From Swiss-Prot:
It comes from Cryptococcus neoformans var. neoformans serotype D (strain JEC21 / ATCC MYA-565). One of its GO terms (biological process) is maturation of LSU-rRNA from tricistronic rRNA transcript (SSU-rRNA, 5.8S rRNA, LSU-rRNA). The gene is ERB1. It is found in: Nucleus, Nucleolus; Nucleus, Nucleoplasm. Keywords: Nucleus, Repeat, Ribosome biogenesis, rRNA processing, WD repeat. This is Ribosome biogenesis protein ERB1.
Length: 830
């Protein structure tokens, strides 16, 4: 309730008059007269208090005159005060009458103690007996007044039987339930509304401003004003909400009351406020954003012409400051000493906070040792482990029968189809306890880590300019008519001629130096699959492969006479023997391969340099010569068990080294110094001993499909290319797996080749590039081969997804010859 207004009574005013003689006089008399009239009316209404008679008023007036004579020094001050207050007397009387009306209204509507009641309780007997004060002189009155105000008040004052002095007629008195013989006053209930000062709106849930999540696990949501639980209202699911939004039009104008946990309908006024906020307007409908401007200080007749201060400017405004000069000199000294750097570029702040930075880590103590890390979880600890990790019934029984110290694990793996179905781990507390024991009881040791520079682990490769010479540019181009695809290319052992086989069925011989075509053979048997020069320098033999036929050729007019004679003797000797025929020679050595026929070409073809035809099953795709130049092997993947054939030119004999092929043979090669034979299938490379007729070893390529193969001149290293864009280097003294697997081409590799004498090798791919590498093979078995990338040669065009098809090194020179699907053969020189 609002505090009750206090009304000054007569008794208290008399005390004020006695205790403050300086304010005596006319002003005091006016105050006494005004208050006495009000107090008399109030005392009359209450039926209590002290009434003053006319005689007492006259006595008071006499006392005042005596006081004026006794204290003449106050007269002048009182007269001045009377003059100053005379003008305010009328206003004071009017204010006093207004206050009396307000006091009367408040006294009718409120109960409790009045000021007059309080003063009456604390009034002394001397104040009530005015008869005794009449005869006392002024000095005695002053002495009593001083003595009264210097004595401790009596504690027993106000302890009378009447506890409540509320006005009669307000409320009703009922016997007290707690104190016998006492009464308490009951009042009517007051309904609080919007006009009330204590409450604005009744809310049945009185929990206050707390998170309602605290009641999520309880059936109720709070308590009412009487302490009873407010149970949670029924909540519909998402389907109910959807139906309410569809069927109930009022659902769109309701909001959820989080305190009551139910939807409350918004009033029209609240909806209007929401609409205004959505339109970015003022929520008050009566607000006028375009009201006229009120010119408080700039309107007509309201200009400020007088300055706020007309004091003259001080001298310090025109004299340089001494203290600023000292501060500036300190800054100048700091700049000269370098402690302050002017125009220092500000350090760029990081855009993102470095959460992994070690800058904020403190240096640990010298004796600090970090705790060992927990081992990472294993597959058996998964909530959904594979079936092989789940124990059987026998294993479960065996595990349960074992002691805890003998068990390998403290748990049995279990399988759950969802993480939410995994129960609590019962050994969690025990494991954490044992972890804590290990942390503060188990001794720790510090392991010294090897400080190895990562750069030292990377091999230091020499610069490419130190490994010259190697091919770097295209110097000569050998263009084929019609841009026909050139599938194969080969160089003569003397390095003077280049042979190429194209899809138009023509074998061409080119001059290496000037790029002129000097010889050609049209075999009329379809595309030329492969061409290969014999490695023997004493002869000039060229083998070309077409569908179902092998052609042994020689450009006799281009070579020296003694070389031409040796070539003819070597190729035609078997025809001169008695066992030789025009269809098949050395028939005793061709057991099981009657389909292979050595035939002699016509006279006209022999004049053009066609020496021998060999009819073979299937379509041979690759040919390779033995280092002596008498044997050569062919591969026809579509010939089943006769896919690999080894032919002897001097005896016109052919034989199949395999009774049953170990897969689809892709490439074959002779060992450069031993009677060994390499056969590459799609994924494996097998090494055979031809003399002992046995398998020596099998190399695992690690690729999906081998496309090409070449053997190093030393015989202990091998490279292969694959259609899955990989090149693998094998060190057969090291392992059966690749020593290096390189993937640098963007498309399939078509050909790889070692240089016969120099430490170089190259690879060709369908991406139209040729990569040149330096390779040094050391005689020391403890040292690995050195591989250094040197150059990427670009020049061939990619036609229908096919780029460079074949490449060969020029013997004795760091030059490379390549052929592509664009109908060009290019010579790359250093």
């Amino acid at each position: 309730m609002a505090p009750q207004p206090l009304k000054v009574g007569t008794s208290k005013l008399s005390k004020m008059v006695k205790s403050a003689p300086k304010t005596a006089g006319k002003a005091k008399k006016r105050a006494v007269e005004q208050v006495s009239e009000e107090s008399d009316e109030e005392f009359g209404d209450q039926g209590s208090g002290i009434d003053m008679s006319d005689d007492e008023e006259e006595v008071d007036g006499d006392d005042e005159e005596d006081e004026d004579e006794a204290f003449p020094e106050f007269d002048s001050e009182l007269e001045d005060n009377d003059q100053e207050e005379a003008s305010d007397e009328e206003q004071d009387e009017q204010d006093t009458s207004d206050e009396s009306e307000i006091v009367e209204e408040d006294s009718d509507s409120e109960s409790g103690y009045n000021t007059s009641d309080i003063e009456r309780m604390y009034a002394s007997d001397d104040d009530l007996s005015s008869e005794e004060n009449k005869d006392l002189p002024v000095d005695e009155k002053l002495s009593r007044l001083i003595a009264k105000n210097t004595v401790k008040p009596d504690d027993s004052i106000g302890t009378d039987d009447k506890i409540s002095r509320a006005k009669e007629g307000v409320g009703r008195l009922v016997p007290s339930k707690h104190v016998k013989g006492s009464f308490v006053r009951e009042y009517d209930e007051y309904e609080a509304g919007y006009g009330s000062e204590s409450s604005t709106e009744d809310n049945p849930n009185t929990v206050g401003n707390i998170p309602m999540e605290w009641y999520d696990d309880l059936p109720h949501i709070g308590y009412d004003v009487n302490g009873r639980k407010i149970f949670r209202p029924l909540q519909g699911d998402e389907l109910d909400k959807f139906l309410a939004n569809v069927e109930d039009p009022s659902a769109w104008t309701s909001a959820e009351d989080k305190l009551l946990q139910q939807n409350v309908q918004l009033s029209d006024k609240e909806l209007d406020i929401i609409r205004r906020l959505e339109r970015a307007e003022n929520p008050d409908a009566d607000f006028d954003p375009y009201q006229p401007t009120i010119e408080w200080f700039t309107g007509e007749g309201k200009e400020r012409v007088m300055p706020l201060s007309a004091a003259p400017e001080p001298k310090r405004r025109f004299v340089p400051s001494k203290w600023e000069h000292k501060k500036i000199m300190k800054i100048v000294k700091a700049i000269r000493e370098g402690r302050i750097i002017p125009n220092k570029p500000s350090a760029e702040k990081p855009r993102f906070y470095p959460i992994w930075s070690d800058a904020d880590q403190h240096n640990p103590h010298v004796m600090y040792m970090p705790a060992p890390q927990l081992p990472p979880p294993k597959t058996a600890e998964s909530y959904n482990p594979p079936e092989e990790y789940l124990p059987t019934e026998e294993e479960k029984a065996e595990w349960e029968a074992m002691d805890k110290e003998d068990r390998k694990t403290d748990f049995l793996p279990e399988k759950y189809d969802a993480l939410r179905k995994v129960p609590g781990y019962k050994n969690l507390v025990q494991e954490k306890f044992e972890r804590c024991l290990d942390l503060y009881l188990a001794p720790r040791t510090r392991r010294v880590k090897l400080n190895i520079d990562p750069d030292s682990l990377i091999p230091k490769l020499p610069a490419p300019k130190e490994l010259k010479p190697f091919p770097i540019a295209s110097t000569v181009q050998y263009r084929h008519p019609g841009d026909t695809r050139v599938r194969s290319v080969s160089t003569s052992p003397d390095g003077q001629w280049i042979a190429s086989g194209s899809e138009d069925g023509v074998v061409r011989v080119w001059d290496l130096g000037n790029g002129r075509e000097v010889w050609r053979w049209d075999l009329h048997a379809g595309p030329i699959q492969y061409v290969e020069w014999s490695p023997s320098r004493e002869e000039s033999l060229l083998v070309a492969l077409v569908a179902g036929k092998i052609a042994v050729l020689s450009p006799l007019a281009l070579v020296a006479p003694h070389i031409a004679a040796q070539t003819l003797t070597h190729s035609n000797t078997a025809f001169a023997t008695s066992s030789a025929t025009t269809k098949q020679g050395a028939g005793n050595e061709v057991k099981g391969i009657e389909s292979v026929k050595w035939t002699r070409p016509s006279e006209r073809e022999r004049e053009r340099g066609v020496l021998v035809y060999v009819e073979v099953p299937g379509t041979p795709k690759q040919v390779t010569w033995h280092r002596k130049g008498d044997y050569f092997a062919t591969v026809a993947s579509d010939a089943a068990n006769k896919s690999v054939l080894i032919h002897q030119l001097s005896r016109h004999g052919s034989q199949s080294p395999f009774r049953k092929t170990p897969g689809t043979i892709q490439r074959v090669a002779f060992h450069p110094s031993k009677p060994h034979f390499f056969a590459a299938t799609q994924r494996y490379i097998r090494l055979y001993d031809l003399a002992a007729q046995k398998l020596i070893r099998t190399l695992q390529s690690g690729v999906k499909w081998i496309s090409s193969m070449d053997v190093h001149s030393g015989g202990d290293n091998l490279i292969i290319g694959s259609y899955d864009k990989k090149l693998a280097w094998f060190d057969m003294d090291l392992s059966a797996k690749p020593y290096k697997t390189l993937r640098y081409h963007n498309r399939a590799l078509r050909s790889v080749a070692y240089h016969p004498t120099l430490p170089l090798f190259a690879s060709a791919s369908d991406d139209g590039t040729v990569h040149i590498f330096h390779c040094t093979v050391y005689t020391d078995l403890m040292q690995n081969p050195l591989i250094v990338p040197l150059k990427i040669l670009r020049g061939h065009k990619v036609i229908d997804g096919i780029g460079v098809l074949d490449l060969r090194w020029v013997p004795g020179k760091p030059w490379l010859v390549s052929s592509g699907a664009d109908g060009e053969v290019r010579l790359w020189c250093s």
